[in-house]
């Protein structure tokens, strides 16, 4: 198998590393249903109730195991949970026998072997970083730039339901120490109801805390502009109102409100264009949008240079995805960290029950080597797919 791979890589101008001390011998894949503690409503009928997360374990010839995770939300990005295993199966000849230490080298080979499919590569990349940290005997944040602060600010995401109920959720979260609030908008395609949602959440938490309204690309530039102009007297940020950068720029220009991007910020080109359009006051650096910790780390560095504040997180998931994002977040310039998200706090089951949880609106990454978490392999049960 490796001889055939080496010939293919040579034809692409790449050579395998024959001096490595570790080799990947097995990749195991699980599909785990994650159920939200409350149904999560977003624009255009998008919901998060029960979705599948994909857990990946990479084993080496020296018995080391690295864990990764990716959890695509249906109808959110060009990714789906049941696409991960086929993509990793296709890449298996390039994965098995490869050196997992120093993930970017292997990921570069995989990009040549199978272009695209970055969401599937994201789970693998996280597992490779976990192994790399274990080999080094260091927590991942030490390899991603070094610890920059003691803990990280969280935001609380509020499902798009009746305005008064959203205000109640915001007050309850604030009472538990939260000071940043994302209000989902557009579930009923009623721009006036969205205005009421933002006004009532803003009033509920009082002056000071960050409040932003997120359409997840689900608004027209007209409706989002009407909402923005109606709340322009308030301390509000808008998030990803429309499906194109140009429409988002129109909303920014008409409302005068700061803007955060999410779905449309997913690679170097989109980050640079959003910055040029002046619509990237803040941006969601989600691991699986970019292709894992390796690519998200490069996006982090670019955003620090461009001056954008970042929400360092992932699309959805449990403890593995949360831990990976926390390591990257804590290694980021604190002046550029808007917030992070404890995804594992919104869903059940927990795949690593002893992983960190929120405390008074903040959270810290795990301290052990690599990801620093203990995955409950017994609870996962037998894997759905084993590549070896």
State the predicted function of each range.
Residues 2-15, 19-27, 32-36, 48, ...:
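Flexible C-terminal active-site loop/helix
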Residues 26, 59-135:
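Metal- or metallocofactor-binding catalytic centers and their adjacent structured scaffolds
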Residues 54-60, 355-358:
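Short beta-strand elements
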